[in-house]
Amino acid sequence: KNKLRVVPLFETLDDLKNAKSIMKSLFSLSWYRKSINYKQEIMIGYSDSSKDAGKLSASWHQYKLQDEILELAKKYKIDITFFHGRGGSAGRGGGPIQATLKSQPPNSVNGKIRITDQGEVIQQKYGYKPLAKYDLCSYIGAVVEATLNPPPKPDVKWKKLIEAMTEISMKSYRGNINEKSDFIRYFRTVTPHKALGKLSIGSRPSKRKNIDNIKSLRAIPWVFAWTQIRLFLPAWLGTTEALNYASSKTFKKTLIDMEKKWPFFN
């Protein structure tokens, strides 16, 4: 008799930060460990965390979550598979699969991985047989490479700098997407976000609640609205301030090292 798998999903920034304590509560239960046969799948949401905190901050906390969960799983002898809810545009975690898997923490792939492919990219990736074969081979090759040749562990200096950068980036990002800001007035004026909710192309409503504010707008229409005007802003908003901080004399050498030696950052 096959049991229904339990796959926790961590999406927002708070979810990512609390993932370790939540999973520790589960893993500490002996009946739970036996129930899952010491195998756990964990899903990481990319769209919501990026909309919540900005791309840089979300990316670093997604990285940290995996690192922390792997350490925890080692203690309880649990085999972890990460399910990455990413793909499509850069604002939703999309990008070449080789670079994607190289940028994960060491030993987080380990011969297996799950990744979503959003509806809008299915046709372009798998609609033509030779292209589908190429894409699937790319996935296999990327998994093998990330398993046999994992990326290096980040240096303490790198971690310290990226922590500071993510805080600066998040504050800048959240300051911009404040409901009262000129930025949001700009978003409402130049993007077709209201029209998107009337299109029958999604599996869910464009808003979580029937309230006309940015917080209630789902992450996918948020990115999609910007994409319609060819302004891929969710992929970089807030990052400029963080890079300006890291480019100062104090951190410049560390920043150059990160770019050259750390696949997560480059």
Please state what every model-predicted region is.
Residues 1-48, 260-266:
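Catalytic alpha/beta active-site cores
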Residues 3, 27-36, 101-119:
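Acidic, His- and aromatic-enriched active-site or binding-groove loops in soluble protein domains
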Residues 11, 83-98:
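Conserved phosphate/anionic-ligand binding catalytic regions in large, soluble enzymes, centered on
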Residues 17-19, 52-53, 92, 123-125:
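Short helix/loop capping segments that flank catalytic or ligand/cofactor-binding pockets
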Residues 18-24, 92-100:
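Catalytic cores of alpha/beta
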Residues 21, 25-28, 61-71:
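Alpha-helical scaffolding segments of alpha/beta enzyme cores, especially the outer helices
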Residues 37-41, 77, 110:
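Active-site lining segments that contact anionic ligands and/or coordinate catalytic metals
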Residues 45-48, 56-66, 73, 78, ...:
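Acidic, glycine-enriched catalytic cores built around paired aspartates
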